[in-house]
């Protein structure tokens, strides 16, 4: 879910690294706000995965949109809390997918979600963040009651100097009949006035925070390249080829990004990349694997506009 990163002084930007649901943070900077201050952030991201070949024949592609909004309030000098909402929609098209019997395993996938952010500032540069969230992930026609993902990201970071913050955390989630636990490594390292190494993503049910190398040549433009891993599950249509089953998409998206700061609080991100090590999986309603199919490197594109006030 969208939430402030545990890292201080992060820039605000967002984009979906792939149709799988990777995304950049669309929240206000994690720097401490004045007590009583409230920041609202909204974003919208159209996304696309171009044609990718399937190992046993056929290909597939998809388009979608991600919309999000968050509100963060600084209650005391050391405590801030916020709420965020998000909705993802994906539309998939399959051409002669032999591994799935020539029939599209899924078509329209929805992922609405809601999350909280709780952030504590300690002494000597320490910060702790808890981000509980709940999400419904389902194909059109599926039972939403059987499509719930829930859990939390917990992280602690320490600022060692004005140019270096490091931290560790974990994501713990129950994702449609499967428990997932994964580590999170937090980095915000200003290598020079123009170069920085940082986490581009908000960790959540689909995976960790990734890593990005950022170049800032001036006040308006920013260029970056990075990657992460992503895996997400969703409940399938009750009347589809695998009634009430579970679909899964796994991949390692790598990308380049160009971002333009349109004003003090608005930003446009243009992203192009490729999804590597991709796999599609279909399980039956009892979570027994039926089909696992690798797909070729898939070109991915995304555009995000976001603003805060």
Residue ranges and their predicted role:
Residues 30-97, 200-201, 216, 221-226, ...:
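Short glycine/proline- and aromatic-enriched beta-strand/turn motifs that initiate or cap beta-hairpins
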Residues 44-50, 85-93, 134-140, 170-176, ...:
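Transmembrane beta-strands of outer-membrane beta-barrel pores
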Residues 34, 73-77, 120-124, 158-162, ...:
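Outer-membrane beta-barrel strand-turn architecture
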Residues 184-194, 256-264, 293-309:
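Outer-membrane beta-barrel "beta-signal"
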């Amino acid at each position: 879910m969208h939430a402030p990163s545990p890292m201080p002084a992060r820039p605000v930007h967002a984009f979906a690294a792939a149709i799988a649901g990777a995304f950049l943070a669309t929240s206000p900077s994690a720097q401490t706000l004045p007590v009583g201050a409230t920041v609202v952030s909204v974003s919208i991201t159209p996304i696309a995965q171009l044609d990718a070949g399937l190992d046993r024949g056929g290909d597939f592609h998809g388009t979608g949109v991600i919309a999000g909004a968050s509100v963060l309030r600084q209650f005391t000098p050391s405590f801030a809390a916020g709420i965020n909402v998000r909705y993802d929609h994906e539309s998939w098209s399959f051409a002669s997918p032999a591994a799935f019997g020539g029939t599209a395993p899924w078509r329209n996938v929805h992922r609405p979600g809601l999350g909280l952010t709780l952030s504590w500032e300690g002494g000597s540069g320490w910060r702790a963040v808890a981000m509980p969230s709940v999400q419904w992930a389902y194909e059109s026609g599926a039972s939403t009651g059987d499509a719930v993902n829930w859990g939390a990201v917990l992280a602690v970071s320490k600022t060692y100097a004005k140019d270096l913050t490091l931290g560790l955390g974990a994501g713990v989630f129950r994702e449609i009949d499967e428990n997932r636990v994964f580590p999170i490594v937090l980095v915000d390292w200003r290598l020079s006035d123009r170069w920085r190494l940082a986490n581009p993503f908000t960790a959540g049910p689909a995976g960790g925070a990734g890593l990005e190398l950022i170049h800032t040549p001036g006040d308006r433009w920013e260029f970056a390249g990075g990657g992460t891993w992503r895996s997400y599950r969703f409940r399938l249509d009750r009347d589809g080829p695998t009634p009430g089953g579970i679909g899964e998409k796994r991949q390692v998206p790598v990308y380049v990004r160009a971002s333009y700061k349109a004003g003090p609080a608005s930003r446009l991100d243009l992203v192009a990349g490729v999804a590597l090590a991709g796999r599609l999986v279909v399980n039956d309603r009892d979570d027994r694997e039926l089909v696992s199919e690798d797909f070729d490197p898939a070109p991915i594109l995304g555009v995000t506009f976001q603003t805060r006030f």
